[in-house]
Curated annotation (Swiss-Prot):
NCBIfam families: cmk. It comes from the Bacteria. GO terms for molecular function: ATP binding; CMP kinase activity; dCMP kinase activity. The keyword Transferase applies. This is Cytidylate kinase. The gene is cmk. CDD domains: CMPK. SUPFAM superfamilies: P-loop containing nucleoside triphosphate hydrolases. Belongs to the cytidylate kinase family. Type 1 subfamily. It holds the Pfam family Cytidylate_kin. Signal peptide: none annotated. GO terms for cellular component: cytoplasm. Coiled coil: none annotated. Its EC number is 2.7.4.25.
């Protein structure tokens, strides 16, 4: 079974997808982390001097594809974690994700991960482009104000103001929804869930109710 969870930044996609995968004992793939891994690498020496095609032709980064474990990212064998969470990396990931060669490269890796079976994929084009025939498609949304507050809590104390985070979210929304290649859209057949006034548990309950009839 393939479950896709798409939506803009700050809607709780990662938290919900990871918890859902754990509840179902499914594999979990955070595709945004895949793009951020490429972005982080591209911002580092010596790879920042390479053309992007050169970088993806011979990537120094890799991803673990192990059944029962979340996908993990490595750069020259070193596990990446907090390095992928900075605004600089997120902004670069958004720019790189607009390149056809980058999207093709990532989508091939994501489909390879799906071969493990029983996966929850979280991203922005999972249900619309990568897995249009997914068994269950969810599109998470929330108000920009709520999303800004959530993102603010994830950042180091006083690193950015609420207004700055809000502006970044609006800009990212515009970039994702207006790009010519695989824009952020509600996938055909997806169930839209507004998480603005819902707890994590409440969102999980709603998604579980959708999935239960489809489980063997």
């Amino acid at each position: 079974m393939i479950i896709t969870i798409d939506g803009p930044s700050g809607t709780g996609k990662s938290t919900i997808a990871k918890a859902l995968a754990k509840d179902l004992n499914f594999n979990y793939c955070n595709t945004g982390a895949m793009y951020r891994t490429l972005a982080y690498t591209y911002l580092c020496e010596p790879w920042k001097h390479l053309a992007i095609q050169e970088l993806i032709d011979n990537p120094p980064f890799s991803f673990s594809f192990v059944s029962g474990q979340p996908l993990e990212a490595f750069l020259e064998g070193n596990l990446l974690s907090v390095e992928l969470g900075t605004p600089e990396v997120a902004n670069m990931a958004s720019k790189l994700s607009q390149l056809p060669e980058v999207r093709f490269f990532m989508q091939q890796l994501q489909r390879k991960y799906a071969e493990l079976g029983n996966c929850v994929f979280e991203g922005r084009d999972m249900g619309s482009k990568v897995f249009p025939d997914a068994d269950v498609k969810i599109f998470l949304t929330a108000s920009a104000e709520v999303r800004a507050l959530r993102r603010l809590k994830d950042l180091p104390h006083n690193s950015l103001s609420k207004e700055a985070v809000y502006a970044q979210l609006i800009k990212r929304d515009e970039t994702d929804s207006q790009r010519s290649l695989d824009p952020l859209v509600i996938p055909e057949g997806a169930v839209v869930l507004d998480s603005s006034d819902l707890t994590i548990s409440q969102v999980l309950e709603k998604i579980s109710a959708l999935i239960s009839p489809k489980l063997p």
